[in-house]
Amino acid sequence: MALRFFNDISRDVNGLFNRDFFHTNPLSLNISTTTENGVNFTLKAKQGVTEGPIQTSVEGRFYDRKEGVSLSQSWSNQNRLNTRIEFSKIAPGWKGDVNAFLTPQSIKNAKFNLSYAQKSFAARTSIDILQPKDFVGSVTLGHRGFVGGTDIAYDTAAGLCARYAMSIGYLAREYSFILSTNNRQCATASFFQNVNRYLQVGTKATLQSKTSSNMNIEFVTRYVPDSISQVKAKIADSGLTTLSYKRNLNKDISLGVGMSFNALQLTEPVHKFGWSLSFSP
């Protein structure tokens, strides 16, 4: 199995903390369908704030398995056009893609990404073809579960390192432990474990030494009572608590509901509630 790229080193714990919490959008709707010739269409709609505007986007994706080439194009009601072409069979271990954006405000960019991965080494580079100011590259090395990597953005115009990040850790089948830091003096320690087939737990400690001497600690858990539902809970030492419930109503429809509140200040008007409905016929 190929080694993870730098951005995926903390994939397990980050997915547990960020995925399937529905309180951020009061309303979210996803509809996905696939035609007989293999073209996938996806419609997404979400309401960022209560009584606010609804943001929508439609995306079409075609994938040629034989050649390893896919073409995706999406358009939103904010007139943002996104086109992505992916090449997954350039050579063994090599992948590449071109991702282009266009908006009415004349914001245009076209990023070219190239990656290579094998069992103990993974690397990825990215550059904006239209505005080649920054060159972004990452390297990851691994051996017997131990992994380490760095990510660097180099400003070619100024001739200096714009940002950097580093991570080291240990990845196993049932658990992982990661230490990370970056040039913004932010240090993070995270732990993830598959306790059993029903329960996952994770914790994260973050220190922003540039702005505060206090360490922020968060805990998260995911419980899967059966094959069609799950319950998640997340709490921070600040008292911010987030709960969510997701259930597959049938093989094509899933419903998710979530809420967040401050357990230390229940009288404060900071509560949020949201729900999500997904159709995949």
UniProtKB/Swiss-Prot annotation:
The keyword Ion transport applies. CDD domains: Porin3_VDAC. GO terms for biological process: cell redox homeostasis; DNA transport; lipid transport. The gene is POR2. It is found in: Mitochondrion outer membrane. GO terms for cellular component: mitochondrial outer membrane; mitochondrion; pore complex. Keywords: ATP-binding, Ion transport, Lipid transport, Membrane, Mitochondrion, Mitochondrion outer membrane, Nucleotide-binding, Porin, Transmembrane, Transmembrane beta strand, Transport. ATP binds at R11, R19. GO terms for molecular function: ATP binding; porin activity; voltage-gated monoatomic anion channel activity. The keyword NADP does not apply. Pfam families: Porin_3. Belongs to the eukaryotic mitochondrial porin family. Its main location: mitochondrion. Non-selective voltage-gated ion channel that mediates the transport of anions and cations through the mitochondrion outer membrane. The channel adopts an open conformation at low or zero membrane potential and a closed conformation at potentials above 30-40 mV. The open state has a weak anion selectivity whereas the closed state is cation-selective. Does not confer permeability to NADH. Catalyzes the scrambling of phospholipids across the outer mitochondrial membrane; the mechanism is unrelated to channel activity and is capable of translocating both anionic and zwitterionic phospholipids. This is Non-selective voltage-gated ion channel 2.
